[in-house]
From Swiss-Prot:
Protein name, as recorded: Putative regulatory protein Cthe_1316
Acidic residues bias spans: 81-93
Organism: Acetivibrio thermocellus (strain ATCC 27405 / DSM 1237 / JCM 9322 / NBRC 103400 / NCIMB 10682 / NRRL B-4536 / VPI 7372) (Clostridium thermocellum)
Family recorded in the similarity comment: Belongs to the RemA family.
Annotated region (Disordered), positions in chain: 74-93
Pfam families: RemA-like (PF04025)
């Protein structure tokens, strides 16, 4: 199970991520408002400015104070590390 740090010690499962987007556009703002009304919004910004909106496969919306590029980089870095670990395990066998 891959976990991604989304800032301030908050971690989400990488397997559940559908999209990581910027909160600037009107459609994303609408998605955030609808999630708030449905009780499906998780605010992980600790009162700071929202810089990334994470959409999960369970229709939860997670707000993060970390840039979308940073979250994506952490996701890609974690995947690369997992591949390297898998390769090393196969060599040991």
């Amino acid at each position: 199970m891959k976990l991604i740090n989304i800032g301030f010690g908050n971690i989400v499962s990488a397997n559940r991520l559908v999209a990581i987007v910027s909160p600037e556009s009107a459609p994303i703002k609408r998605i955030i408002q609808e999630a708030r009304e449905r009780g499906m919004l998780v605010d992980a910004t600790y009162g700071r400015r929202t810089r990334a909106v994470i959409i999960t496969d369970s229709d939860h919306i997670i707000l993060s104070a970390v840039q979308p590029e940073t979250v994506a980089h952490r996701l890609n870095t974690k995947e690369a590390e997992d591949v390297e670990v898998d390769d090393e395990e196969e060599i040991d066998e």
